[in-house]
Amino acid sequence: MPKKKEDSQKTLSEKEAKGLIAKLSDEIRHHQYLYYVKNDPKISDFDFDQLFRRLQDLEEEFPQFKDLASPTLVVGSDLDKDFEKFQHKLPVLSLINTYNDNELLEWVNKTDPEGLYSVEWKIDGASIVLYYENGILKNGVTRGSGGIGDDVTDNIRTIRNIPLRLPKPITVYLRGEVFMTFKDFEEFNALSSGKYANPRNLSAGSIKQKNSSDTAKRPLRIFTYDATFPNMEKKFKTHQEIFSKLEKLTFPVPPNTAFVSGSKIAKTIQEFKKQKDSLGFPTDGLVIKLNDISKRDALGYTSHSPRWARAYKFDAIMKESKIVDITYAVGRTGKITPRAEIEPISLAGTTVTFATLHNQDYIDELGVGIGAIVRVAKRGEIIPAVEEVVTPGKEVFKIPDRCPSCNTQTIKKESLVDLFCPNPDCPDRVKNGIIFYCQRKQMDIEGLGDKQIEFLYDHDYIKSIADLYDLKDQKEKLMEEEGFGEKSVNIILKGIEQSKQKDFRFLLPSLGLSELGHKVTELLIEHGIDSIDEILSIAKDQKKIESLLEIPGIGPSTIQAFQENFSDKRILKLIERLKKAGLKMKADPIQVADQQPFAGQSWCVTGSFENFQPRDKAMDLIVYYGGRKVSAVSSKTTHLLAGPGAGSKLEKANELGVSVYDEKQFLDLLKSLKIDFKNLI
């Protein structure tokens, strides 16, 4: 149990206190530099806050040693010498963090116990300030020191959900957070050989690219969460009014923001925690703000933060364990990733027995070895990772120089720290390539999970993606295998057959070719390169290949990969076999947005469904045909698709007069629109 402040500090002499304040100040500045400038934090938010609070307590106890450059008086800085500096028009402050309900409720009771508060997601991304003048985006600026930031306007303009022109010619300054969804991060990181640790680091690095065309290739998004309207005569009375105004101006805001009384904050926090794992974007907590603007003004600010808001950080998901072994996995690209087998720990609600070690450089930097006591965290809430060594093992682990799957000599690719297996026939590479092809977000072949694919490969049923389409010829033999009864085999074969109807825009990125993911595929299709014949024709003509550079979002690395992919005899043979199997080699035409059946409609989906598992499949279908996805029912929602377990969303939809469809009615609607949903989901 931690000591109370008076127990831990009053025993210090003035000389000791002065020295400790100086030491803590230097340590905090160092970690602020690593976090804000290098995007490479070495300690958790929780540990940083403990250092910060310790310094605050000491300065309160020994005010004679607090100087004007104390970290407690200034905001951490992300200033970079490579960008023009911009003087913020208002101070850009940070928030005081709280880590438990009691601490937060103590603040609420002291601030305004009966007042109304907003509870909104704290996005784990890169902080940005947007400056609009007369409705035009003039500047996008990092938080910087809080007074001066880096002008990254050209990079910010590439973010697709940031409006460059507003519906009205007004002047407004906005705070926002640039982020990347988990799905987009995984796809981008896969194309980048997994070199990025988490979405936050990638987002922060992306807005600091020297060339905005590089930023444009990255699937960045933004949520805005506060605004100042300097020239508006009518002042807003509440934060809720500001949020409403932001939405009317087409700014994206954090979903499901709640406005509740102080007495309901604890219950609301628990409700938010239940939603956290299904959000799809990184969050490290909640932000609680007093709703009444006049009360905010009365409370005011410290030099570091507003007195009317707090950040509620979720439990620090980092625990200690012992490394019992270190193994390494070979991915579909050949990248060899070491991972630590650890004594089981519970982390973020799951039992963790493995944690990634990324690469040899990472192992060397931390000094990781078998037998070490380490701290493990969920990095970006995706993959558990070893974060630091508490007690070293016997010796630092070295990855062998031969592939663990096929014994081929490993290589290092230019500018990458990872080791790769160069053998395209490496069993683990092939298996993981087939697993990738069958995943839901790729060709979505039902019944074929990792274990089934590994079995089929190891027992010589399949040795490539194309072999899947010959599996029907071995149906009788397969049904005799343990775990493969007639029912499960029929499901697998049906899934394989249905995949033949998947649009070419899914097929091409599912092949796992370097630099040819969903985003690049869509860019090609948008510019008329919508078939394999067109792609192969371009690949044979150097001038046509170079002309691809004219497409925004396609750069030299994509061009190089394009040439390499479509001159590779193995890939050409695979494409030819898939052609013969009957897969679609030309993209289906997409209707003009305002001609699509769900154009102009806002749909919310809730409950469970027989034909749409998971229910995201129903939403994907609606969006594919022009509808807009919303996560909560409001007066702007036009339709609700409700299955069993719909709960409060159904009640609210009925109250607001929103059109409600159950699954049967929705299927009838699809039928009337002549939408064959089974070939699309």
From Swiss-Prot:
Q: Name one GO biological process term.
A: DNA repair
Superkingdom, taxonomy of origin: Bacteria
GO cellular component assignments: cytosol
The residues that hold Zn(2+) are C403, C406, C421, C426
Question: Which SUPFAM superfamilies does the record associate with it?
Answer: BRCT domain, DNA ligase/mRNA capping enzyme, catalytic domain, Nucleic acid-binding proteins, RuvA domain 2-like
Which reaction is this enzyme known to catalyze?
NAD(+) + (deoxyribonucleotide)n-3'-hydroxyl + 5'-phospho-(deoxyribonucleotide)m = (deoxyribonucleotide)n+m + AMP + beta-nicotinamide D-nucleotide
Q: Name one GO molecular function term.
A: metal ion binding
Q: Which Pfam families match?
A: BRCT, DNA_ligase_aden, DNA_ligase_OB, DNA_ligase_ZBD, HHH_5, Nlig-Ia
Checking Gene3D superfamilies in the record gives: 5' to 3' exonuclease, C-terminal subdomain, 6.20.10.30, BRCT domain, DNA ligase/mRNA capping enzyme, Helix hairpin bin, Nucleic acid-binding proteins
Q: Which residues form the BRCT domain?
A: 593-681
The positions flagged as active site in the entry are K122
Task: Give the enzyme's EC designation.
Answer: 6.5.1.2
PROSITE patterns reported for this sequence: BRCT
In this chain, NAD(+) is annotated as bound at: D45, F46, D47, F48, D49, S94, L95, E120, R143, E177, K289, K313
- Tell me its cofactors: Mg(2+); Mn(2+)
Its function, per the record, reads: DNA ligase that catalyzes the formation of phosphodiester linkages between 5'-phosphoryl and 3'-hydroxyl groups in double-stranded DNA using NAD as a coenzyme and as the energy source for the reaction. It is essential for DNA replication and repair of damaged DNA.
Q: Which family does it belong to?
A: Belongs to the NAD-dependent DNA ligase family. LigA subfamily.
Which protein, by its recorded name, is this? DNA ligase
Q: Highest lineage ranks of the organism?
A: Bacteria, Pseudomonadati, Spirochaetota, Spirochaetia, Leptospirales
